Amino acid sequence: MFKFFSSFGDSNEKEIRALEPLVDKINQLENSFTTLSDEALKAKTIEFRARLKNTFETTTAGIQEDITSTTAELAEAQKIADNSKQSRLKAKLESLNKDLSAKENTALNGILPEAFAAVREASRRTIGLRHYDVQLIGGIVLHHGKIAEMRTGEGKTLVATLPLYLNSLLGKGVHLVTVNDYLARRDAYWMGPVYHALGVSVSSIYPMQTPTEELPSRLFDPDYTSEIPGDPWTHFRPISRQEAYKADITYGTSTEFGFDYLRDNLRPDLAQCVQRDMNYAIVDEIDNLLIDEARTPLIISAPDTEAGKLYDVFARLSPRLVVVKDYEINEKDRNAELTEDGWANVEKLLSREGVMKGNSLYDPQNAPLIRHLRNALSAKEFYKKDHQYVVKEGEIIIIDEFTGRMMLGRRYSEGLHQAIEAKEHVKVQQESKTYATVTIQNLFRMYRKLCGMTGTAATEAEEFSKIYKLEVVIIPTNKPAVREDYGDQIYKDQSAKFKAVVNEIDEMRKLGRPVLVGTVSIENSEMLSNMLKRQGIEHKVLNAKQHEKEAQVVAEAGKPGAVTVATNMAGRGVDILLGGKEPTKDDAKVYNEWQAHHQQVLEAGGLHVIGTERHESRRIDNQLRGRSGRQGDPGSSRFYVALDDDIMRRFGSERIQGIMEWAGMDENTPIENGLVSRTLENAQKRVEGYHFDVRKHLVEYDDVVNKHREVIYAERRKILSGADLKSNILDMIREEIITQTAEHTRGYDSSEWNLDGLVTHLNGIFTLPAEINAEALAKLSQEEITDLLTRTAEELYQKKEDETGAGSMRLLERIIMLHTLDSLWVEHLTIMENLRREIGLQAFAQRDPLIAYKNEGHVRFQELLETIKHDVVHNIYRVGIQIQHQTESATAKAASRPVQQQKPLPAAPAAAIPGVSAKAATQSTTPAAKEIGRNDPCPCGSGKKYKKCCGK
C-alpha cells in the first residue's frame, strides 16, 4: 500500500517509510480490538493509564524534583539580576524538561499501537468512520510533535483523535486549536462519541459573552439533553471554564486559549484561575495561525482617557497634503515620510489649528503629533475601505487580507484604528491602556509539545523550523490526486482579466461543472458579482459581509452548474462535496437525487477553481486550488492575473510588460507560458522571504518583553500560591536600609555624613523610636548604624504583625505585593510600547535598533524590579488591615473587563484569522460590600483617595 510514496522527496519518503512497521502493528491489533465489548474497550483507558503511571514512578521522579529545585533557584537569580546564573539555570531547566518529555514520549510510544487501535475501533463503532492507514501515519506524525501536511478532504478532524487520546492519558490535559468557534464546537461534538466510548472527557470552550457568564463552555455528555428546541448541540452540557480545562481534551480557538492565559495572570486568587499548565496542543490550519496570524498580539486593555480631538484635526489635515510634494510613500514597507516642504506645510497647518506647541514640530513636546500624523497618512494611503476594512453600523471593522472575513472585536493598535475612524467620520473610540498582552507566537511556544495540521505547510517549512522548531511531513493522500492545474493566464489590465474570468465561468457551468471563484477583496467579489448578473449567470457570493452563512453556502457549492464567488479562503474548514451536501439516507428520494447530482458532476470533470489574482503567498494560492480534487475526485484550477494586480505592480510586472509588447499582443490576448509562471513564483518567493524576515525580526523584539513577562508572572504565581512573602519583604527592607545608609554615610569622616537625611528618609517608611535620631547615630560606625536600623525595622514589623494578627499580616503582604506588581507592570508595558515605537531612530545614530531595544529594555526592567521593592517597602508599614475587605488590585479588576484582540501597525501586510470579541469572567471570592466612590478614602488604609490607590 506504500508503493505511491516514491513521488515524494527523499527525506519525506524516508520519514514515511520509517513509520510502516508501526502502522503494521496497529493493523495487526485490529481484530483483537474488534472482539472487545464496549465495557472492555472503555476499560483499556484505565489499563493504559496504570501502565504509564508505573513507568513514570520509576523513571521520572528524580527529574521532577530537579525541575522544582532548579525553577526555584532561577526565580531567585532573576530577582537579583544575576545574568550568568540565570543563563546556566535556564540551560539546565531546558535540559531537564527535554529529559522529562523524552521519557514521557518513550512511555507513550510503548502503548501507541494499542491506543491507536482502540481509537480506530471506537470511531468505527460510534460514528462509522475507520481510520485509513495514511490517517494513522498522520496521527503518528502529530504525536511526534511535527506538522502533518494533509490535502483538503483527507480527514484531519478524524486524524486528530489519535494523538489527542494518546497524549490525554498523561492526565495533564491536551488542546485542539481551531480557526473559529464554529469548528471548535463542531469538531468536539462530532468526535465526542469516540472519546466517550473510551472513557475520555472532551469539552469545547466558547467565547464569554458577558463578564458574569458562569457557563461559557460545553462538555460532551450523551446522558444530557438540551432543553432548547432544535438545538444542534443537544448533548453538549453547559459547564464552567474551570471544568472545561479539567477535561482530558479541550477544543477551542487560539484567542480563547490566549485570553484565558492572560486573564489567569490578572486574577487575585489562584482558585479563580482556569487553565492548567500548557502541555500538548494540536493546531488545526497551523499555517494560518503561526504564520499569517503570528504578529497579532492578544491584548487585555481598558480605555485611556487621553487623546481625542487630535484624530479629527489630522483627519482634516491629511487630505490637504499632496503625495510627492509633501510626502513620499513606500508601498513595499507601507510607510510615508514627509518631505522638507511637507514639514513646513504641516507646521503651518498645525499652528493654524492651534495644536502645535512652540515654533517647530521637532520640539520634544510635539512628539505625540508625529505619531498622529503618521497614523493619518497611513490611514489615507494604505488602508482602503472595502479592502482592509469595512464601515458597518458606524464602526470600522477590519477585513482579514487572507480570508476576506470581518474580524469583529479586533482593532488596529497604536492609534491607527482611531485615525481610520476619524478619516471615515465615524465616532472615534477611546484609546486603551494595556493590562496584559502576549503574541500568538509566544503563546504557542509555551506548550511543552506542539504540532499541527494543514493542507499547505511545505512552502513555509523553513519558518516553522527556525522559529518554532517544527518539522513538516507531507502525508500521502488515501487516493491519488487527479486535479489538473492549468497555467496562469496574464492580461494587460483588470477589465480584460475579469471579462475572461466571466467567460470561463459561463463555459464551465454550461458543462455542468460547479465553479468556485476566489477573489482578494470584498470590492472585487461584488464587482464580479455585478458582471455575472449582467450576463444572467446565477451565483452566490461568499464574503465577509455574509460570513454567518458561509458553512451552508460552501457545503452547497459542489452542485451541478453552481457558481460561488468567495473572498479568498472564506469557508475554510468546510469541505465542498461534489453534488452538494450529502443528505442522510432517511429520505430515499432525496438521497437518490443527490447521488445523481454527484455522478453528474464527477462525469463533467468535478469542481473548477478560478483564482482572480495571485496572492503574495504561494501557500494561500495552494489553499484555493486545494478546494478542488478532494479524496481523489476529478477537478481543475486556473489563475488569472493582470499586470496591474498588486503583486505584479510591486514585483516583476515590467519584465512581463516587455514580453507582451515584444510579442505585439493586445489587451484581450493572454500570455500563458513557463517564463511568466516562473516570474510570478519568484515574485511570490521574494514577498514571502520579506515577510519571513519581518516576522523573525519581530520575534526577537517580542522576546524582550516575553522574558520580562515570564519573570513577573512567575513572581505573581508565587505571591498567590502562599509563598513566604514575609522573608522576601524583610529582605527588601534590609536592602533599602543598607542602600540608604551607604548613600547617606559616604566618606571616611562622620562629620560629612547626612544623618538627618537618613533619619528623614527612614521615617518615611516607618516611624523610628525617638531615641534613634541623628545625634545618636553619629556615635556609631556605618556597620553599627546598619545593624541598629535593620534590627529596629524587624522589631517594628513584628510589632505590627502582633497587633494585626499573623493571618491578617499575611493577607496584607499578599495584597500589597500583588497591587504593586500589577500596577507597575501595566506602566512597564506602556514604557516598552513607547520604547519600541521610538527605537527605530537609533538607526540614524548608526546603532542597531534591536540591540538598543534589548539594552534599554533590560535597564527599564531592572528599574521596574527596583521600583517594586521600593513601593512595597514604603507601603507595608503604613497600610492598615482594612485591606482585607478590598482584595482586588487594579489589574485584577481588568480581568473582568472586555478584552480586545488587536493588530499591530504592520511593517508589511499581515494576515489574521477571524477573531471574536472576548470578555473575561471574574468569580469574586470577597463578600459583597458597599460600592466605593472614586473620591472616597481608599479602604486599604493608605490615606489616599480610592481612585489614586486601589481604584486605579
From Swiss-Prot:
Region of interest (Disordered), residue spans: 907-946
SMART domains in the cross-refs: SecA_DEAD, SecA_PP_bind
Organism annotation: Dehalococcoides mccartyi (strain CBDB1)
Compartment(s): Cell membrane; Cytoplasm
Role: Part of the Sec protein translocase complex. Interacts with the SecYEG preprotein conducting channel. Has a central role in coupling the hydrolysis of ATP to the transfer of proteins into and across the cell membrane, serving as an ATP-driven molecular motor driving the stepwise translocation of polypeptide chains across the membrane.
Name of the coding gene: secA
PANTHER family: CHLOROPLAST PROTEIN-TRANSPORTING ATPASE, SECA INNER MEMBRANE COMPONENT OF SEC PROTEIN SECRETION SYSTEM
Compositionally biased tracts (Low complexity): 907-921
Name the record gives this protein: Protein translocase subunit SecA
